[in-house]
């Protein structure tokens, strides 16, 4: 059964600004969305800034609204972090002190509010380090298995599929890296990674496994899959009552055998041409 609850993005905003989820507007929900997307994979102020720019969020205005709602212990920690950042000439990304403090406080509140996820980042990074150092030994982290064989670090996903990282290394400081395509230069180069980034990799991969795993059943039911976009299936079907968005959503939200208990839901609409809802 699908577990019911508040909209995740509204809940994130409501917690940060001390209001009820029901009172969160559509525009303010975007701030909650930025919080979840930026902070869910060990991101900090820099990640918050990146996602805020993508979603058109004014961090200075947000800082003015939120500064008085922050718990004092959290704000004290953020003030200490800001002092350390300035002392060590670390970037503040052109933000005012108030905006920086609010972003950092949101980060801290999110991590305190999601201890299982925060510990997952650390545990996954430690398992990856150990696997790189000790080839041929399998390490487990939650539902994942990590092992290095030869020039490959592999993470076995709950579905049985593998994520593969070529030429994994640890530097003198114990930082992880592997070879891959640089997203900016598009050149083959050494890429740094960490617990939060690895968590993002496995989360996105598992999500893809859910989406792709239900595609055969969707096509068997008579829906022709034209393409998929992120978490969407775009299909064509005959213009008959039995083919409808609710039926397709039910097929997409079928829980795979390897993910028992995973709450899934889907929604959709019918249209003559592809568009965003």
Residue ranges of predicted features:
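Conserved catalytic core of nucleotide polymerization and phosphodiester-bond processing enzymes
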Residues: 1-277
